[in-house]
Amino acid sequence: MPNEFSDETTRLIANFLNEIGLEVIAKQIEIETFLPGILIDRGRIFVDESKLKYAGDLLHEAGHLAFASPEFRLTLSGEVVFPGVSMEPIEVQAIAWSYAAALYLGIDPKIVFHDGGYRGASQGLLFSLSCGVYFGLTGLRQAGMTVFGDDAVNSGIQPYPHMIKWLCD
């Protein structure tokens, strides 16, 4: 359970993910994983805190799971891949999702966009996002997760990075 995490940020993220419907479970992981200390198995996120390098990686991986339907999410294990779909847009959407989640939780986005991630592009991504240069929003809007631009003005709903919902239906 999330309260089994000793790190405050990991606990905060795990609680949030469990609250929105993504199951996070503290568990010792004996196998090598795509990201140290994180194992996706049938849509659940197992976390070995002793091996976890960056708590923010939980939000990014959750961002991938968030775009799967509940039924499809249960089939996802290991490195999250959507068969027959280019992963580039899903990656960009997960970046946008995890940035919004970090702001919602009140944690420094540098926790998600750390120097060890995004193939060396973390600082550039974070700079763009902090300047309001958002990407991945079309997918978030199509999934009903957020609004932006004229849609936000016309609907009276706060625009991204505010999220209407966190998971695809």
Residue ranges and their predicted role:
Residues 9, 55, 90:
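Hydrophobic (often cysteine-bearing) scaffold residues that line and stabilize catalytic clefts
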Residues 101-117:
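Short helix/loop segments within enzyme catalytic domains
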Residues 121-169:
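Pan-zinc metallopeptidase signature
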Residues 56-69:
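Active-site recognition of the HExxH zinc-binding catalytic motif
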Residues 1-24, 166:
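A metal-dependent hydrolase signature that marks the N-terminal structural subdomain at the beginning
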Residues 4, 42-57:
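Short pre-active-site segment immediately N-terminal to the catalytic Zn-binding motif
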Residues 19, 23-42, 119-123:
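Catalytic zinc-binding patch centered on the HExxH motif and its immediate surroundings
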Residues 33-34, 67-98, 118-120:
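Post-HEXXH active-site segment of zinc metalloproteases
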